[in-house]
């Protein structure tokens, strides 16, 4: 099995693309501040899923990287809220749509983490 078959990876990949595209809607001064931060934190969500999956042979490593990924998603949600609250992201429907998708991903990631904690042996090393 490949990490690309994980639903949490697929959802995070979609969000990386959506967040990346959303950041070009911001004023120029935000391109190098909050917009850059939200792109990085969202990419970190996906990357930590991949790295954790690559270390799935070692239960604690797998869990640690999933926790890093969840923390990065929390950071991303905070950046999204900041962009909305400061008026840098003016499209409230886009903001709400992204927030809903991130919240759904968060729930799925927590569920996946619990599954790994309880059933680690079901994840073959290769």
Where are these regions (language model features)?
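Amphipathic alpha-helical assembly/interaction segments
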Residues: 1-126
């Amino acid at each position: 099995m490949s990490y690309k078959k994980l639903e949490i990876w697929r959802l995070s990949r979609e969000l990386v693309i959506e967040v990346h595209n959303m950041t070009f809607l911001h004023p120029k001064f935000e391109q190098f501040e909050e917009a850059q931060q939200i792109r990085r934190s969202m990419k970190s969500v996906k990357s930590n899923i991949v790295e954790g999956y690559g270390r799935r042979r070692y239960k604690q490593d797998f869990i640690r990287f999933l926790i890093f990924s969840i923390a990065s998603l929390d950071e991303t949600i905070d950046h999204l809220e900041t962009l909305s609250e400061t008026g840098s992201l003016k499209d409230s429907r886009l903001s709400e749509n992204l927030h809903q998708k991130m919240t759904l991903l968060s729930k799925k990631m927590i569920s996946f983490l619990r599954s790994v904690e309880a059933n680690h042996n079901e994840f073959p090393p290769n």
